[in-house]
From Swiss-Prot:
Cofactors: pyruvate
Biological role stated in the UniProt entry: Catalyzes the pyruvoyl-dependent decarboxylation of aspartate to produce beta-alanine.
Reactions this protein catalyses: L-aspartate + H(+) = beta-alanine + CO2
Record EC number: 4.1.1.11
Protein name per its UniProtKB record: Aspartate 1-decarboxylase
Binding site for substrate: T57, G73, A74, A75
Lineage of source species: Bacteria, Pseudomonadati, Pseudomonadota, Gammaproteobacteria, Enterobacterales
Family indicated by similarity: Belongs to the PanD family.
Length: 126
């Protein structure tokens, strides 16, 4: 059996730009891409915490250290500057590998300040 697993996640980054007329994609600070293990041109899902919209696009690199999250093209209708979003990528793998897989997660606060990284998502408690 093949399973689709979370590969990497940027948790609660803030949109810094939204450019309707750029040709598409989401530009992401290269440091952030590295932290989540997301590659340039990789498919990503974006979940907008602020407005509830969910959409897919692909990642492109923004300048390292810039803290840029720029939602571009038609996707700019789904996010505005200042919105808080979660950006995720996924990977497929055999069931036996999936059972021990741990995703790359980066957590953010404020103006895209990376607070920590982890190889797991905490267990949710009531």
């Amino acid at each position: 059996m093949i399973r689709t697993m979370l590969q990497g996640k940027l948790h609660r980054v803030k949109v810094t730009h939204a450019d309707l007329h750029y040709e598409g994609s989401c530009a992401i600070d290269q440091d952030f891409l590295d932290a989540a293990g997301i590659l340039e041109n990789e498919a990503i899902d974006i979940w907008n915490v602020t407005n509830g919209k969910r959409f897919s696009t692909y990642a492109i690199a923004a300048e390292r250290g810039s803290r840029i999250i720029s939602v571009n093209g038609a996707a700019a209708h789904c996010a505005s500057v200042g919105d808080i979003v979660i950006i995720a990528s996924f990977v497929t793998m055999p069931d036996e590998e999936a059972r021990t897989w741990r995703p790359n997660v980066a957590y953010f606060e404020g103006d895209n300040e990376m607070k920590r990284t982890a190889k797991a998502i905490p267990v949710q408690v009531a």
